[in-house]
Amino acid sequence: MIVIPRYTIIKEKASSRIPEILDNLNLKNPLVITGKNTKKYNKDFDFIYYDEIETSDLENIKNYANDYDSIMGIGGGRPIDIGKLIAHKSKKPFLSVPTTASNDGIASPIVSLTQPSYMTEAPIAIIADIGIIKKSPKKLLSAGMGDIVSNITAVLDWELGKIEKSEKYSDSSGIFSKTIAIELMDYVLNSNLEEYPKKLVKALIGSGISIAIAHSSRPASGSEHLFSHALDIMKEKYDIDTDSLHGEQCGVGTLAIAQIYFEEKKLDIETFEMIKKSLKAVDAPITAKQLGFDDEIVIEALSSAHALRNRHTILRNGISKTEARKILEKSEII
């Protein structure tokens, strides 16, 4: 069964409608999962800080919900992911109240606390207060663009899985995901960006719904996400001091993977340039240096990314460091 949100509110002062939405859903007593910086947006309900929750104990995490009829995540990625996980384990509805728009986790059924990611259910309601979101750090909103453009290469990888490995593929989900990315890119390249936060939130919610339709992260996560996860491993392995975000890394990864698809004549140069210009338009990183990585680190990440998940992509069985360097140079990432 496909589960998608029953209520999606995307507007200024949307948070004022939380009591109304709860009443419509016949919910009286939610537990709010939030952070210290976003606690101020919760004025009415019991709450717990996300960093006080032990997420490794999956069997007992449901106990946080014992005295409540629902779970509400208020904040960025981690409060929302942890809220989804508690709701899933306790079999209670989840409401997503994002305070920024850096990735499609605000709407998807995926929990990305660990790798591989964890499938739960999509939120029963999404309340996105644009007045709050547009005040969030520009870096977070730029990262959201990186997460959206990655749909282009993710869908290409999914189609490749269907062709080369007879993988199950959903035309409706694939087309929906790709269209969301193209429409947002078209907007940022042909506007003054005044409505960018709202357009971005709509795109991220649409991307999350495409995942719910497919019941798989495939329409929004491919080899570019593997590249991002590889960079996360590099950060820890080499103790690299950079504040690069998931969406930023996915955006740069999308350029690298798009270059490979271009060389295999499966993506045209116009689409590649559209991706690059869209990232630049919102001041998202397009080079390794802008992410905070040396050339050799991103080369190692690209050449090792294929091994991080049993998922067929354009990386197939992996590429050598020599090949990775050529791809990264041609795409001007290094």
UniProtKB/Swiss-Prot annotation:
User: Where does this one sit in the cell?
Assistant: Cytoplasm
Cofactor comment: Binds 1 zinc ion per subunit.
Q: Which UniProt keywords apply?
A: Cytoplasm, Lipid biosynthesis, Lipid metabolism, Metal-binding, NAD, NADP, Oxidoreductase, Phospholipid biosynthesis, Phospholipid metabolism, Zinc
Top EC group? oxidoreductase
Domain of life (superkingdom): Archaea
Binding positions (Zn(2+)) = D147, H225, H246
Q: Name one GO molecular function term.
A: metal ion binding
The UniProt entry, under InterPro entries, shows:
G1P_dehydrogenase_arc, G1PDH, Glycerol_DH
The pathway this protein participates in, as annotated, is: Membrane lipid metabolism; glycerophospholipid metabolism
Q: What is its main location?
A: cytoplasm
* Cofactor(s) this protein cannot do without: Zn(2+)
Task: Quote a single Gene Ontology cellular component term.
Answer: cytoplasm
- Stated EC number for the protein is 1.1.1.261
Q: Which reaction does it catalyse?
A: sn-glycerol 1-phosphate + NAD(+) = dihydroxyacetone phosphate + NADH + H(+); sn-glycerol 1-phosphate + NADP(+) = dihydroxyacetone phosphate + NADPH + H(+)
Residues annotated to bind substrate: D104, D147, H229
GO biological process terms on file? glycerophospholipid metabolic process; phospholipid biosynthetic process
Give binding positions for NAD(+): G77, R78, P79, I80, D81, T99, T100, A101, S102, S108
Q: Which PANTHER family match?
A: GLYCEROL DEHYDROGENASE, GLYCEROL DEHYDROGENASE 1
Q: Which family does it belong to?
A: Belongs to the glycerol-1-phosphate dehydrogenase family.
Q: What does this protein do?
A: Catalyzes the NAD(P)H-dependent reduction of dihydroxyacetonephosphate (DHAP or glycerone phosphate) to glycerol 1-phosphate (G1P). The G1P thus generated is used as the glycerophosphate backbone of phospholipids in the cellular membranes of Archaea.
Its recorded name reads: Glycerol-1-phosphate dehydrogenase [NAD(P)+]
- Look up and give the organism this protein is from: Methanococcus maripaludis (strain C5 / ATCC BAA-1333)
Which gene carries the instructions for this protein?
egsA
